[in-house]
């Protein structure tokens, strides 16, 4: 069974962030506070999400105090908006190939239930994996720093002979699947755009057993379930 991380593995998390930027910028323009292009320039030129929201909120407060478009409102919009994101071609290529081979797939992801569910729906991932094999920390109560989500996946799929986890973040993606005897594969951030830097200066127990630079490369790996 092949189990995936979601953010910065099956798609780039920056795309979700940019999607929220567009929603916020359109609202600023709709209210006549800032043009869409000006709002997007402020958001995209301010580093990470928190910095971007803070920058735009200050600008809006100076132009339209009390309008309600606060930093808190922007963070909530980021978390709850319907994302305009699509599954990258290489992700779709891999998922379709695994599906055609009859390989069972799953997802273990950290985040709020509504946020992650919105991403999963937008990316069309339900067509590749059973609902019982989509585990979200906001629903299970355990993130990937814990044994539980990986053990839960094994418990739900006792007929599987082996498990592989494909992720991007060595800080938490691989330590527990390694401990449970899974294969572990890191999708390397060759563009340097991931939300979490891939710091490999860690104990061996945290590191993946294999690195790939693109998801379709997984098809060339000698894994018993592929």
PLM regions with names:
Residues 79-106, 147:
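Short, acidic loop-to-helix structural element flanking the phosphoryl-transfer center
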Residues 1-38:
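Active-site neighborhood of HAD-like aspartate-dependent phosphohydrolases
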Residues 109:
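Conserved phosphate-coupling serine/threonine residues in phosphotransfer and NTP-handling enzymes
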Residues 29, 34, 43-79, 97:
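A metal-dependent, Asp-based hydrolase signature
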Residues 45-49, 83-85, 142:
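Acidic-and-aromatic substrate-binding clefts and catalytic sites of carbohydrate-active enzymes
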Residues 17-26, 50-58, 113, 117:
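An amphipathic alpha-helix signature
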Residues 1-3, 106, 164, 210:
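Hydrophobic "anchor" residues on beta-strands that sit immediately upstream
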Residues 96, 112-226:
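Asp-based, Mg2+/Mn2+-dependent phosphohydrolase catalytic module
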